Amino acid sequence: MQVTSRRRVTHLTAGQAIARPETLVVEEPLEIRVGGAAVTVTMRTPGSDFELAQGFLLTEGIIGAREDVHSIRYCAGCGEDGANSYNVLDVTLAAGLGRPELDVTRNFYTTSSCGVCGKASLEAVRSVSRFSPAADPATVAAATLQAMPHQLRSAQKVFDSTGGLHAAALFRADGTMLVVREDVGRHNAVDKVIGWALEQQRLPLRATVLLVSGRASFELAQKTVMAGIPVLAAVSAPSSLAVSLAEESGVTLVAFLREDSMNIYTRADRIG
């Protein structure tokens, strides 16, 4: 599966028009099915799709561990020509786990513009979260945290050629980078990271930091809580609802993270 494509563009500069090739990030739909029933469709950059699906199902409260997934496969014959498009995959849950109700799964938040009531959102997250970040005693040195954006940026290989991808990375509290994923959607990048952790049987993600390349929205805070991550850091701004959820859930929320500064919105006791 390709993550980039090439296209000729007309570049205007200093009054001159120059035709040249440009690299674009690929964006394609991914339909996630559970037991043959469609649960969601997300626009994503192809790659790490199984991680994406498992991270999504974990953060939706549908699964809680790798053992909850019996198998994952791409659905053959979904392309217009009958070929495998690799844009539809089906997750078979382990025996004893029922297929999720579609109206329940649709109560969750795959975009930041769904208009869900804030109070209802907070209550929904509390009711399905299997892990409690609040009790995590982990601490992170401020200097360690401030070094993370550079590590993340250095690992963004596709961004270098396209300039069009979000990224998420998981770090140990000592600053060791565990994994980084890029995607056209920031929530997809986070789901891929969490799906990787689930496959590695690392959940709950105690003593870790989730760093995102953009802003900290409610949906990213929700995914942080669902994975048991104690620290969420962002290079850009947080939303008010993200701060509220972090405060209620005991997550340390850091934003505007720079090499020499940061804003700590909740649980500042974890930052030394």
UniProtKB/Swiss-Prot annotation:
Family: Belongs to the FdhD family.
Functional summary from the UniProt entry: Required for formate dehydrogenase (FDH) activity. Acts as a sulfur carrier protein that transfers sulfur from IscS to the molybdenum cofactor prior to its insertion into FDH.
Alphabetical list of SUPFAM superfamilies matching this protein: Cytidine deaminase-like
Predominant place of localization: cytoplasm
Entry GO terms, CC: cytoplasm
Name of the protein in question: Sulfur carrier protein FdhD
Cell compartment(s), UniProt: Cytoplasm
Keywords, in A-Z order: Cytoplasm, Molybdenum cofactor biosynthesis
Single GO biological process annotation from the record: Mo-molybdopterin cofactor biosynthetic process
HAMAP family: FdhD
Organism for this UniProt entry: Mycolicibacterium paratuberculosis (strain ATCC BAA-968 / K-10)
InterPro entries (UniProt xref): Cytidine_deaminase-like, FdhD
A GO term, aspect molecular function: sulfurtransferase activity
